[in-house]
C-alpha cells in the first residue's frame, strides 16, 4: 500500500514538473520571438518614422495608418505582449491590465528614444525629445 501511494505521488509530481517545464518553454519562446520581431527592420523603420509608438496600456499603437505588413507585425507583437503580461499577472497575483500598465510606463520611460512616438496620458501622441516623457501619475 505504501509503495502504491509513493508511486501515485511520484506520477503526480512528474506530471506537475512536466507542466511547469512546458510553461517555461512556452514563455521563453514568446519572449524570444517578441525580441526577434522587435529587431525586425520593418518594425525598427516604422518606429523610427513615427508610424507606431508605445501606448500607455503596454501595447504598441498606430500613430498613422500602417501598411498591411506593419499592421501584421504590430498585431503579432501585441499578442505576444498580452501572453507575457498574462504570465506575469498569474505569477504576481495581479491583473493582466495592471501588468500591461506597469510595463507600458517602463517602456515609455526607458525604451523610447528622442524622435520616437509615445502615447501621453491624455491619449495624444507625443514625440520623445531629450526631456523625460509625459507619463501617467500612477506610473511607478
What are these regions (language model features)?
Residues 1-6, 12:
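Short, Lys/Arg-enriched N-terminal segments with co-localized hydrophobic residues
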Residues 20-31:
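Bacterial N-terminal signal peptides
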Residues 38-72, 97-140:
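Amphipathic, charged alpha-helical segments and their helix-to-coil junctions
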Residues 74-92:
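Short, well-ordered alpha-helical segments
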Amino acid at each position: 500500500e505504501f509503495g502504491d501511494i509513493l508511486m501515485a505521488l511520484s506520477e503526480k509530481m512528474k506530471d506537475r514538473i512536466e507542466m511547469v517545464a512546458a510553461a517555461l518553454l512556452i514563455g521563453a519562446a514568446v519572449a524570444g520571438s517578441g525580441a526577434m520581431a522587435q529587431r525586425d527592420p520593418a518594425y525598427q523603420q516604422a518606429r523610427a518614422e513615427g508610424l507606431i509608438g508605445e501606448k500607455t496600456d503596454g501595447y504598441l499603437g498606430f500613430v498613422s495608418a500602417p501598411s498591411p505588413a506593419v499592421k501584421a507585425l504590430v498585431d503579432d507583437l501585441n499578442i505576444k505582449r498580452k501572453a507575457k503580461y498574462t504570465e506575469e499577472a498569474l505569477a504576481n497575483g495581479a491583473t493582466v491590465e495592471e501588468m500591461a500598465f506597469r510595463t507600458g510606463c517602463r517602456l515609455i520611460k526607458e525604451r523610447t528614444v528622442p524622435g520616437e512616438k509615445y502615447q501621453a496620458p491624455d491619449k495624444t501622441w507625443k514625440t520623445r525629445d531629450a526631456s523625460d516623457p509625459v507619463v501617467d501619475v500612477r506610473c511607478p
